[in-house]
Amino acid sequence: MDKVPITIRGYAALEEELKHRQQVERPRIIQAIAEARALGDLSENAEYHAAKEAQSLNEGRVLELESLISRAEIIDVSKLSGTKVKFGATVQLIDEDTEEEKTYQIVGEPEADVRSGRVSITSPVARALIGKGVGDTVEVTTPGGGKSYEIVGIRYVG
C-alpha cells in the first residue's frame, strides 16, 4: 500500500470525520433502522430502505477513512522550508493574463479543496509548481484550458 502524504491538519480532519461517523452517525442510523423495522412490512417500507442505504454509505466511508488513516504519511509543514515549491508549500501566484493573485497550498489528495485554496499534490497546478521558485513562470493545462502564472511567493506554514 502506498503512503499518502497529508498535513497534520488534514490528518486531524480525517480522524474527526471517522470518529463522528462511528460514534454519531452509526448509532443514529441503527436507531432509524430499528424504528423503520417496527413499522412492519419491510418489502414496501421506504424508511427502512433509506436507512439501510444510509448505513451502507456510512460504512463505506468509514472503511475509506480507516484506509486513508492507516496509509497516511503525516508531514508537519511548519518544519519545512526552502526556496522551491514542494508538498505543503503555500504559493502565491499572479495570473499573467488577468493580473489576478491566487494563493494555493499543496496538500494530500484527501484534504484537497480548491475553493479553500488547497490543491492536491497530484493536480495539474501542483505538478506544474513542484520544484519551481519565486520569479518562475509556470504553464498549467487544466480542463478549462491553458493558464500562465508567475510565482511571487512561497512559504511554509502549518
From Swiss-Prot:
GO molecular function: DNA binding; RNA polymerase binding
Cited InterPro entries: GreA/GreB_C_sf, TF_GreA/GreB_CS, Tscrpt_elong_fac_GreA, Tscrpt_elong_fac_GreA/B, Tscrpt_elong_fac_GreA/B_C, Tscrpt_elong_fac_GreA/B_fam, Tscrpt_elong_fac_GreA/B_N, Tscrpt_elong_fac_GreA/B_N_sf
Key words of the record: DNA-binding, Transcription, Transcription regulation
GO biological-process terms attached to the record: DNA-templated transcription elongation; regulation of DNA-templated transcription elongation
Superkingdom of the source species: Bacteria
Any matching Pfam family: GreA_GreB_N
Record keyword Transmembrane helix present: no
Entries under HAMAP family matching the protein: GreA_GreB
Family according to the record: Belongs to the GreA/GreB family.
Protein name in UniProt: Transcription elongation factor GreA
Species this chain originates from: Methylobacterium sp. (strain 4-46)
Gene encoding the protein: greA
